[in-house]
Each structure stands twice: as C-alpha cells, then as structure tokens.
C-alpha cells in the first residue's frame, strides 16, 4: 500500500489575491455579497482541483475563510457576543465582518474583537469571546456545505477544524478561572464537535482533521485533563469517521503518551519545529496499533525547497516504530505564497531553490513516492538526484567584509551611554515637548493615487525625478495637516515605501524580491516578504534624504522612521544555511549605519520599529532566552548604541502578549516605546506598572485596524486608564499602529479627536 499524502490547509486568498479584492470591494459597496460568494466558490474549486491533480490523497476542506478560521469556529459554536448579535444583520457574513472589523453605522457602533498573533507566525487571529450567557450550539452549515461542494466536483475531502482544546485555550472566557474552565462550557463545546462528526458520518467523510496547535505549548495545571475530557467524549462518538489530531509549530513530547492512548486514528507531528522531541516520544512510547502517524516533513512556514534526503530519514525513523506512516505538510500552507509560477524577476537558477504552496504539493507527492521506493529505485531516482543537487555545494558566496565587521564587535557596542534616566532628562530639555506628547506611529494612508504613481515609476511611465517631486508634495501636505491638528512629534508619512520590510530589503545587499508572493496577515491584509538570499549590508543611505527633507519643512520635531533588524528578519523569508542570530547581526549593523546618518542629518527622534519582536518568541518558556531573547534584544541595542544622549530612540511593537517579556523589552534600552494595545483592553498597563517599566511608553489609544472613528471622550477615557498605571511624565499619546491601510476619511477625524483628548487631559492636570 502506497504512503498516504495529506495537506493540512491551503492558502485561501487566491493566486492574484482575488479574495482580498472582492471582499474589499464589498466593504466599499462596489459589489454585492453574491459576488463575494461566487469568487470564493471559484477559488475553493480551483484549489481543490490543484491538489487533486497533484495526487494528494487527503485534501482539506473548511480551511477556507472570509477572514479567519478562529472566527469561523466561534460562529460555528455560536460564540457571538450580544453586542454583535444585536446588530441583527440578515446574513452571517456581515456579523462575521463586524466581529472582525468593528461596525459603525445605522445599526449601531461596536468595536472589533481583540486580535492576536497566531503562535509564532505573522498571521493574526480574532480572539473569541465567550459570554457567560452564551448558548453553545451548532450554528453554521459552512463545513458541510464546502464538503458537499467538493464532492459535487468529484473530490472527497478531509474537513479541517480548529480543535476544541485550542479554541477554549485561546478564547476569552471571563467567567472561567485560569486553572479550570467551566465544565458546562467544556461539555457544550464537546457536544458540538460530536454533532459535527455525526453529520460527517452521514455525509460519508472518511477523515476529519482537528487542529490542536495549543498542545505544543507548556501545560498549565488542568490542561491535560481538559484535553482528555474533550476527546474522550468526541472520540467515543466518532462512528466511522477517522479523526486526525493535527499538531504543529512545536513538539508534543510531554503529552504524546496520553494522546497515543486516546484512540485517535491519526496523529500529526511537526517534524520541522518539533523534530527531535517528537521522534524521541514516538520511539519511547510507540504508536497505537490503529493509529497512523502523519509525518509533517514539508515545512508550511518557509519557501525553501525541501531536502528529500532529510525527509526520507525522518520517515524511516518513524517506520522503525510503526508501519502506519503518512506524509504531510508540517502545518497549513496558509503561511506561504501560492506559486513560484510567474516569478520571472528571479533568475531561474535561483528560483529552483524555492517551493511555494503549489510546489510543496509536488514535493509532498515525491517524498511519499520515494518513501515507498526500494534502495535501488532511490539511487536511480532523477527526482532525488535533482533535489540533492540543490543542497550540494555553495548556493551564494559569503561577503568577507560583513564577516569581518561582525568579528570586530565588542561588548561595548551593545551598550548605550549614559544611563536612560540621565538621557531622558537631557532629551526633555532638548526637545521641549509638552506633557503627554502626541505623535503617530509613522505611516499615513497610501491612497490609490500614491500606489498608481509608484506603479508608473515601476513601469517606466514617469521619471524618478517626477516621482520624487510627487512624493515631496505628499510629504508637504501631510506635514501641514499634522501641524494644523496640533500633533507634537511629526512624521513624513512613508509615502515612498511600499512595505516597511520590503522597502528596506530593496535598499540592502543580500535580498531577493518576488512579484506576487503574497501571504495573508489578517483578514484581507496581505504581505509580500522579501527573501534573505545572501549576506546583508547597506550600500547607501536609505531614508535620510526623505527625513531630512521633511525636517526642513517644519519647525516641529520630525521623527525618522526605520524598521529594526529582528522585524526585518521575522517578516522576511530567512536563510536556512546560517542561524537567525547571525542574520540579525548583519541586519543590525546595516540599520545602525542608517541611524547614525539620520542623526548626522539633524533628526533628533528616530523610531526603530520592532513590530515583530514578540512573535518569534519560542512557544516553550524554557527556550525564550537561550534560543531567542539572548540575541534578539542585544541586536536592537547594537542598532542604537552609538547615538548621542540627546537623540531620542523610539520603538514600536505590534499585536502581541507583552506582559511576560516586559523586562526584556525594557532591556532593549529604547527611550520611548509605543505598543499596539487597544484591542487587548490595555492589559499591558498592569505589566508596565508591576515591572516598574523605565522606558517611556505610548500604549495605543485607539484601534487603527478598524474603520470606526473613536470619539474624543473615548480616547480621553483611555488616557485616564493609562494614567492610573503609569507616571504621567512617561506617557505618550498615539494610535495603535501605522495608518497606511486606513483611509483619510477616518484617519484625520480620529487624530483630531486624539489631539483634542490629550489637550483636554493636559488642561485638567494643569488645574
């Protein structure tokens, strides 16, 4: 019998971001919901047929979503807070969008659900909110409709769900204690999954996949018992459906013995990020006789080609324990671009080193075929030989100048002088800012006109000189508008930048760029990460000309805007032939050069965004420092350690759980940090207070990911919440994040309310 192949999930935005475009058109009133549904159905059919043509045995369904799979699960379970239910939309999609984006209109005014990073990825999920009065019940036909959709095309699929354990651990359950979820809630959730399996029994599904990535985290008291309670109920009622427990982003060695005894038909193990521990657990505890191990050998989180010899070695190691081994993607392919097809900007000799989602289907099938081959057949295999050739020899030559510069670094290069308290006093005097200074995070809306002008430059339809004049006009206008509404520290708007990471990559040595390698970040927001191809260095100044021009146009303090080294790496496709630490040092030195040039050009405030610092923190607490923070935090210090005491260094961080690393963030030794905080109900304030946080801070006072406009009173209330926990002298007032993806129609009224709120609070404090 040939080795089964299984795909955990497939990208849903479409090869050309069709889903993004049709949904955003619906939000703007350019098309109706029927058009959205038609495009979605076309994409699903295309993606199923692609996987069928590639010969994949277990093709996923229900991995499609209009916005987010956790949000879909909340709706499936009827976990819809009353504030959204009361909007009384006549379709489930508009309720979903209101939960994801907030709503402000004739039906009411509600903020969006909180949004957080999905484990260590750059994907964001909506945090479900389980109200005490929630009636947990099966509330959606989506999984069954999509299964039948595929069946009508002649394709049998494997329905995929976020599992109940992960859902409950990630949901906000206000009435539950930290250690023990309400048993009524647990039983109700389990009952819905039982009902789901019963329906798939009726529909004739062979397999159902339940994703439980939360299993790879450290366990709290009661976690294992919760998992057992849920799955004892679910598996006892599974009927003829085979249940695949799928785990990813780490290992489950600490619970593998328990999982193995529960009676799952399949257990999916990540053999990229949890390789050694998972293999050791399987070797130690064996595999139940009726269980198939799904070996996650095809990495769902990178774009480099799979090393077949390595994958075959992993499959062979499992086959020493059990004959029941399938090969699978290590996680959903949601986190990689669609296809390398059409990437003509990358030389063919380089492109052959990459595999996007479509190419990973072929890799999966080839690994499965080779796993079934005899040793003689492997030796004769052209596919195996061609694959091995990619890993033999040197892919790219090293840059000796980069290595030499890193080799000369000393401990002093990672320490800024004088101490922060002394610097803060000097900076207050030098900058002359008021109490509760107001600023923005950096970017302003990139209108259709700006994007069109950039496209013209790319196509050679306008000269570089004409484009630069256009950008200068945008900068002039945004400076004037910021001055008019009364912001204290201004920014130039970043109109020259397509993306905060790609822009820097395009101006550094060592990067490759794609035309269409988009991946979903949240909802319809997509990103196109650059590829770290070789050693990184800065050839010329990148931002200095624009920042210096902007400063020349105002007497206000102008903030220089940079992306930090950890974020550039975390939001790029990193190399696999050298460590992340080494790549980050290279980037830190390149950005350090830019910081010093900005300072020399008269820029007194420089923001070095580390938006993605938290997201790559290892999932196991014991790994936090030794595998990440011990080099990530010093890399940031290396960037700014040589500036003058009067130069104020800012940083910014995006949606994350900051509380547990708040002291490490303080150790970055920035002068000011802004947090994305409003969707997290400002819980970071308690951590700042309890840690005696020394860095000045601006927890975001309104959510920029929602189109709604916060009132002056709403922002004023937020400021007082902040002042309850922070020293007023250390508080900055700013939005949650950059404003690039917002429209001018909501941006300026929101900022006017922000400035008015800050002034109102200042006035009351002065009395």
From Swiss-Prot:
Catalytic positions are: 705
One GO BP annotation here?
A: methylation
Q: In which pathway does it act?
A: Amino-acid biosynthesis; L-methionine biosynthesis via de novo pathway; L-methionine from L-homocysteine (MetE route): step 1/1
Superkingdom of origin: Bacteria
| Cofactor requirement | Zn(2+)
> What keyword terms does UniProt attach to this protein?
Amino-acid biosynthesis, Metal-binding, Methionine biosynthesis, Methyltransferase, Repeat, Transferase, Zinc
- Cofactor, free-text remark: Binds 1 zinc ion per subunit.
**Would I find Transferase among this entry's keywords?**
yes
MF GO annotations: 5-methyltetrahydropteroyltriglutamate-homocysteine S-methyltransferase activity; zinc ion binding
Which residues make up the binding site for L-methionine? 441-443, 494, 609
Residues that, per the record, bind 5-methyltetrahydropteroyltri-L-glutamate: 17-20, 117, 525-526, 571, 615
Q: Which amino acids does the record list as binding L-homocysteine?
A: 441-443, 494, 609
ATP-binding found in the keyword field: no
* Any Pfam family hit: Meth_synt_2
Q: Which positions does UniProt annotate for Zn(2+) binding?
A: 652, 654, 676, 737
Physiological role:
Catalyzes the transfer of a methyl group from 5-methyltetrahydrofolate to homocysteine resulting in methionine formation.
Its family remark reads:
Belongs to the vitamin-B12 independent methionine synthase family.
Q: What is this protein called?
A: 5-methyltetrahydropteroyltriglutamate--homocysteine methyltransferase
Organism equals Bifidobacterium longum (strain NCC 2705)
User: What taxonomic ancestry is recorded?
Assistant: Bacteria, Bacillati, Actinomycetota, Actinomycetes, Bifidobacteriales
Q: Its gene?
A: metE
């Amino acid at each position: 019998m040939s080795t089964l192949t299984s795909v955990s999930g497939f990208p849903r935005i479409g090869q050309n971001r069709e889903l993004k475009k049709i949904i955003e058109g619906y939000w703007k009133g350019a098309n109706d919901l029927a058009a959205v549904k038609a495009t979605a159905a076309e994409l699903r059919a295309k993606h199923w047929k692609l996987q069928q043509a590639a010969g994949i045995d277990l093709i996923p369904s229900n991995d499609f979503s209009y916005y987010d799979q956790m949000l879909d699960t909340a709706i499936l379970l009827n976990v819809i807070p009353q504030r959204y239910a009361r909007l009384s939309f006549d379709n489930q999609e508009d309720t979903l969008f209101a939960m994801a984006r907030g709503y402000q209109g004739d039906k009411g005014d509600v903020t969006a659900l909180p949004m957080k990073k999905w484990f260590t990825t750059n994907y964001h999920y909506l945090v479900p909110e389980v109200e005490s009065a929630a009636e947990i019940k099966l509330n959606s036909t989506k999984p069954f409709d999509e299964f039948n959709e595929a069946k009508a095309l002649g394709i049998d699929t494997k329905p995929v769900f976020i599992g109940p354990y992960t859902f409950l651990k990630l949901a906000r359950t206000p009435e539950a204690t930290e250690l023990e979820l309400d048993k009524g809630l647990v039983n109700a959730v389990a009952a819905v999954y039982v009902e789901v399996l019963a329906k798939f029994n009726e529909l004739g599904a062979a397999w159902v996949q339940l994703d439980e990535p939360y299993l790879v985290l450290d366990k709290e008291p009661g976690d294992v018992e919760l998992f057992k309670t849920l799955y004892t109920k679910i598996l006892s009622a599974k009927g003829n459906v085979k249940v695949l427990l799928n785990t990813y982003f780490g290992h489950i060695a600490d619970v593998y013995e328990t999982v193995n005894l529960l009676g799952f038909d399949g257990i999916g193990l990540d053999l990229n990020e949890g390789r050694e521990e998972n293999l050791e657990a399987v070797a130690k505890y064996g595999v139940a006789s009726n269980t198939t191990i799904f070996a996650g050998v095809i990495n769902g989180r990178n774009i480099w080609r799979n090393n077949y010899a390595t994958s075959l070695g992993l499959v062979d190691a499992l086959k020493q324990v059990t004959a029941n081994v399938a090969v699978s993607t290590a996680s959903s392919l949601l986190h990689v671009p669609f296809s390398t097809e059409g990437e003509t900007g990358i030389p063919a000799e380089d492109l052959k080193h990459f595999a996007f989602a479509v190419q990973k289907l072929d890799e999966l099938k080839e690994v499965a075929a080779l796993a079934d081959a005899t040793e003689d057949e492997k030796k004769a295999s052209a596919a195996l030989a061609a694959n091995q050739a990619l890993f033999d020899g040197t892919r790219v030559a090293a840059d000796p100048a980069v290595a030499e510069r890193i080799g000369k670094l000393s401990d002093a290069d990672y320490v800024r002088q004088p101490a922060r308290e002394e610097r803060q006093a000097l900076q207050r005097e030098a900058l002359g800012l008021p109490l509760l200074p107001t600023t923005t995070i950096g970017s302003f809306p990139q209108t259709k006109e700006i994007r069109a002008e950039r496209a013209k430059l790319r196509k050679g339809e306008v000269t570089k000189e004409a484009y630069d004049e256009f950008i200068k006009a945008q900068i002039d206008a945004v400076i004037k508008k910021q001055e008019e509404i009364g912001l204290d520290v201004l920014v130039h708007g970043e109109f020259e930048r397509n993306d905060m990471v790609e822009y820097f990559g395009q101006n550094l040595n060592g990067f490759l760029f794609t035309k269409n390698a988009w991946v979903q970040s949240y909802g319809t927001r997509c990103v196109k990460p650059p590829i770290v191809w070789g050693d990184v260095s800065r050839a010329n100044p990148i931002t200095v000309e624009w920042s210096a021009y902007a400063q020349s146009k105002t007497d206000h303090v102008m903030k220089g805007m940079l992306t930090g080294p950890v974020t550039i790496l975390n939001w790029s496709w990193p190399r696999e032939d050298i460590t992340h630490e080494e790549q980050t040092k290279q980037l830190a030195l390149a950005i350090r050069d830019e910081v010093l040039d900005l300072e020399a050009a008269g820029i007194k405030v420089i923001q070095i965004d580390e938006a993605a610092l938290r997201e790559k923190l290892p999932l196991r607490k014991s790994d936090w420092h030794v595998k990440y923070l011990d080099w990530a935090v010093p890399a940031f210090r290396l960037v700014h350690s040589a500036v003058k005491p009067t130069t104020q260094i800012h940083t910014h961080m995006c949606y994350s759980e900051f509380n547990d690393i708040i002291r490490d963030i303080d150790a970055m030794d920035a002068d000011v940090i802004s947090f994305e905080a409003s969707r997290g109900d400002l819980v970071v304030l308690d951590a700042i207070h309890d840690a005696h946080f020394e860095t000045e801070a601006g927890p975001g006072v309104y959510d920029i990911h929602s189109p709604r406009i916060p009132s002056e009173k709403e922002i004023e209330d937020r400021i007082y919440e902040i002042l309850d926990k922070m020293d007023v002298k250390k508080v900055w007032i700013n939005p949650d994040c950059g404003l690039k993806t917002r429209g001018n129609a909501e941006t300026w009224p929101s900022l006017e309310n922000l400035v008015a709120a800050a002034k109102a609070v200042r006035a009351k404090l002065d009395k």
